[in-house]
Amino acid sequence: MAGRTVTRADLCEAVYQQVGLSRTESAQLVEMVLKEIADCLARGETVKLSSFGSFVVREKGERVGRNPKTGEEVPIEPRRVMVFKPSSILKHRINGTVGDGLDED
């Protein structure tokens, strides 16, 4: 069921083919966009791409975990995690269904 994996090189090639920039300029554009998204997330900002979805950074508090081998309780440090929430349009597109055209994110 798994399809092929799309890489940075694939994205650069798609920009090259569809936008008409040189391969070097296409690669630079893709890198700039990905860097900006990563920088925003590192600052704790939400990145919302209309009709695609949102990348959200969430804070997870400290909690107690358990070592599965020994059963010993171990504290799990607080951390930040990134979550992707797809838009309803993307969900409908993936599932091949017709949506109402309204983006809920």
Curated annotation (Swiss-Prot):
Name the GO terms of the biological process aspect: DNA recombination; positive regulation of metabolic process; regulation of DNA-templated transcription; regulation of translation
Question: By its UniProt entry, which Gene3D superfamilies does this protein fall under?
Answer: IHF-like DNA-binding proteins
Give yes or no: UniProt keyword Kinase.
no
Family matches, as InterPro entries: Hist_DNA-bd, Histone-like_DNA-bd_CS, IHF-like_DNA-bd_dom_sf, IHF_alpha
Keywords tagged on the record: DNA recombination, DNA-binding, Transcription, Transcription regulation, Translation regulation
Q: What GO cellular-component annotations does this UniProt entry give?
A: cytosol
NCBIfam families assigned to the protein according to its UniProt record, in alphabetical order: himA (TIGR00987), PRK00285.1 (NF001401)
Question: What HAMAP family has UniProt attached to this entry?
Answer: IHF_alpha
Name the UniProt record assigns to this protein: Integration host factor subunit alpha
* Native source species: Xanthobacter autotrophicus (strain ATCC BAA-1158 / Py2)
